[in-house]
Regions:
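Aromatic/hydrophobic pocket-lining residues that form π-stacking "cages" and hydrophobic walls in ligand
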Residues: 20, 50, 117
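Glycine-rich loop at the start of a catalytic domain that most often binds anionic cofactors/ligands
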Residues: 44-52
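Generic short alpha-helical segment signal, independent of protein family or function
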Residues: 52-55, 59, 89
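Histidine/acidic residue-rich metal-binding segments in metalloenzymes
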Residues: 79-95, 101-174
């Protein structure tokens, strides 16, 4: 395999975008692009514009396919799931718990607040990608992932059994 896929890529935006996109495209044929920019890539239209900026930043003749994701927010319109499923370039919706990582301030405080979107994702077979960390003053930093599994992931699986989820520790060990 001479040019594999990168399944978790942060390209950022602005000056960093050109450098990281060119470097990535030399080694990888495709990459799943994370949506945690400022502002977040939360709509298909925003993902389309970001994808265009990525492609424009590549050297001429570069063969590289950015696979776009949307940033799940508690205000996301469930109709956005339908647009994502029909887009041909959005491969999933990424959930960042609020305050868990870089640019996660627009993230969700609980997946319970996103039920309508998650129901549409289940119906349309859209992948939910999880940044699986619990946040809050009651959470020990060393227990963030295990508490996320207990408080968010396991209830999510019970409520939405057909929802496609991607979370490495949960897949590997639970």
């Amino acid at each position: 395999m001479t040019r594999p896929d990168d399944w978790h890529l942060h390209l950022r935006d602005g000056p960093e975008l050109a450098a990281v996109a060119a470097f990535t495209a030399r080694a990888f044929a495709r990459a799943v692009v994370m949506p945690n920019l400022k502002p977040p890539v939360a709509t298909v239209d925003a993902a389309r514009r970001y994808r265009e900026r990525i492609l424009a930043a590549l050297p001429a003749g570069t063969a590289f396919e950015p696979l776009m994701t949307l940033y799940l927010t508690e205000r996301m319109d469930p109709a956005e799931v339908y647009r994502a499923a029909q887009s041909g370039f959005v491969v999933g919706i990424k959930c960042y718990p609020a305050g868990s990582t870089t640019h996660s301030d627009a993230g969700v405080t609980s997946l319970d607040h996103c039920r309508a979107v998650l129901e549409r994702m289940e119906e349309r077979d859209v992948v939910l990608q999880l940044h699986g960390e619990a946040t809050g003053n009651d959470v020990d930093p060393y227990d963030r992932e295990s508490i996320f599994i207990e408080r968010e992931l396991l209830p999510l699986v019970r409520r939405h059994p057909r929802l496609h989820r991607r979370y490495r520790p949960a897949v590997a060990g639970r």
